[in-house]
From Swiss-Prot:
GO terms for molecular function: DNA binding; DNA-directed RNA polymerase activity. One of its GO terms (biological process) is DNA-templated transcription. Belongs to the RNA polymerase subunit omega family. It is an enzyme of class 2 (transferase). It comes from the Bacteria. It catalyses: RNA(n) + a ribonucleoside 5'-triphosphate = RNA(n+1) + diphosphate. Its EC number is 2.7.7.6. Keywords: DNA-directed RNA polymerase, Nucleotidyltransferase, Transcription, Transferase. This is DNA-directed RNA polymerase subunit omega. Promotes RNA polymerase assembly. Latches the N- and C-terminal regions of the beta' subunit thereby facilitating its interaction with the beta and alpha subunits. NCBIfam families: rpoZ (TIGR00690). It comes from Listeria innocua serovar 6a (strain ATCC BAA-680 / CLIP 11262). PANTHER family: DNA-DIRECTED RNA POLYMERASE SUBUNIT OMEGA.
Length: 67
């Protein structure tokens, strides 16, 4: 079973499209900037997995810029 589960992640960000977009952007940033991340430890070795763990932990959120 994958950690974190899609059901738990959708409690943090309400749409699958937004979830994938946020995770992909964070993963790309971590890869390009050699960012070690904001959590003390990660279960995943891959950038996308680390981004999803950050979303699950509440350290990475979606900002809605609509006015």
């Amino acid at each position: 079973m994958l950690y974190p589960s899609i059901d738990n992640l959708l409690l943090k960000i309400d749409s699958k499209y937004s979830l994938v977009t946020v995770a992909a952007k964070r993963a790309r940033y971590m890869q390009l900037e050699n960012d070690k991340g904001v959590l003390p430890s990660y279960q995943s070795d891959k950038f996308v997995g680390k981004a999803l763990e950050e979303i699950h932990a509440g350290k990475l959120v979606l900002q809605n810029d609509e006015k």
